[in-house]
């Protein structure tokens, strides 16, 4: 039995819990605790009802200082200092740190000092962590000795399997990526102050360029592409699902059919459950609650002069990533 604790019960933290239960309940994983500074009543309410993902089809209620999900009692804490949490007493194997705030080795060591066996960040971390994992691409590097791991980002999990597949088939020279991301909690409902002047503007009224470290994150997973990719990102007025526009140049001459068939083969083979492929005339909302890391829209693949390839891919930046958090947790524990 893998005992996990969730530190930070926001969009990803709640989706991790929902994904664990909705997937038929992996009997080998149990959530034993949640640490969140919000009111317990609000935590229960947002577990039961979700604007993006609908109602949670398991009974949830408060039970003293715990949350009862079905027959499972999950201890609730509101502690700012992770080193003071009772991870040792609870026998926590892995802390899923979903705060979006912590991200260094020193941050993770606070959980380890409290008695946790390992820590998995739900976001890109500093370079001093033991490993950064994109499940399906490099989770095999886990040896069991890693105690502090990052699950990268939702966009890295979306684009890296595609880049790795196409590089293996056609030898990529370089590329650019545009992320078209749904609005996030760090944006404003109406114009208000923010250190990023673009994010002072109302999220529902504009397409908003934001900074992204996606290219650096990609290099950490695929170091042979250091300096070969650049990325930009915009936020759009939707609440979930992200599109990614990938352009690459390749050494081998290719056609649209070549590219699409390579991705279809990968989706049926080594990347089954991670990568999906469609040619249906779908829009972003159709990918809401899709557990894949990436869904290729084959109708949008373009090739210019046999070497310049452009394609469109989708991901549910919440649900898909939450499922990868669970996959990486299993891989960390299976490695030893």
Curated annotation (Swiss-Prot):
Site entry: Activates thiol group during catalysis: 181
Swiss-Prot/TrEMBL catalytic activity: D-erythrose 4-phosphate + NAD(+) + H2O = 4-phospho-D-erythronate + NADH + 2 H(+)
CDD domains: GAPDH_C_E4PDH (cd23937), GAPDH_N_E4PDH (cd17892)
Enzyme Commission numbers on file: 1.2.1.72
One GO MF term attached to the UniProt entry: erythrose-4-phosphate dehydrogenase activity
Gene3D superfamilies linked: Dihydrodipicolinate Reductase, domain 2, NAD(P)-binding Rossmann-like Domain
UniProt similarity note: Belongs to the glyceraldehyde-3-phosphate dehydrogenase family. Epd subfamily.
Protein name as annotated: D-erythrose-4-phosphate dehydrogenase
């Amino acid at each position: 039995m893998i005992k996990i604790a969730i530190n930070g019960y926001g969009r990803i933290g709640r989706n991790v819990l929902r994904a664990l239960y909705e997937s038929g309940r992996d009997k080998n994983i149990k959530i034993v605790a949640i640490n969140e500074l919000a009111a317990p009543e609000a935590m229960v309410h947002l577990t039961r009802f979700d604007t993006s993902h609908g109602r949670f089809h398991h009974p949830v209620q408060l039970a003293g200082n715990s949350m009862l999900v079905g027959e499972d009692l999950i201890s609730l804490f509101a502690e700012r200092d992770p080193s003071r949490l009772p991870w040792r007493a609870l026998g926590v194997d892995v802390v899923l740190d979903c705060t979006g705030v912590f991200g260094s080795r020193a941050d993770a060591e606070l959980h380890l000092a409290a008695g946790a066996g390992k820590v998995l960040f739900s976001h890109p971390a500093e370079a001093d962590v033991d490993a950064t994992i994109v499940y399906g691409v490099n989770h095999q590097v886990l040896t069991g000795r890693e105690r502090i791991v990052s699950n990268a980002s939702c966009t890295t999990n979306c684009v890296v399997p595609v880049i790795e597949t196409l590089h293996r088939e056609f030898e990529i020279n370089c590329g650019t990526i545009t992320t078209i991301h749904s609005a996030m909690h760090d944006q404003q409902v109406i114009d208000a102050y923010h250190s990023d002047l673009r994010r002072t503007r109302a999220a529902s009224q504009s397409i908003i360029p934001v900074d992204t470290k996606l290219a650096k994150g990609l290099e950490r997973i695929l170091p042979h592409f250091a300096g070969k990719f650049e990325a930009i990102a915009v936020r759009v007025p939707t609440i979930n699902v992200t599109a990614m526009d990938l352009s690459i140049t390749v050494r081998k001459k290719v056609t649209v059919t070549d590219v699409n068939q390579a991705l279809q083969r990968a989706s049926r083979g080594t990347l089954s459950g991670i990568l999906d492929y469609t040619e249906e005339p779908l829009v972003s909302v159709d990918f809401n609650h899709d557990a894949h890391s990436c869904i290729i829209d084959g109708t949008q693949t373009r090739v210019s002069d046999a070497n310049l390839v452009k394609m469109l891919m989708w991901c549910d930046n919440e649900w898909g990533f939450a499922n990868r958090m669970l996959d990486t947790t299993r891989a960390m524990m299976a490695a030893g």
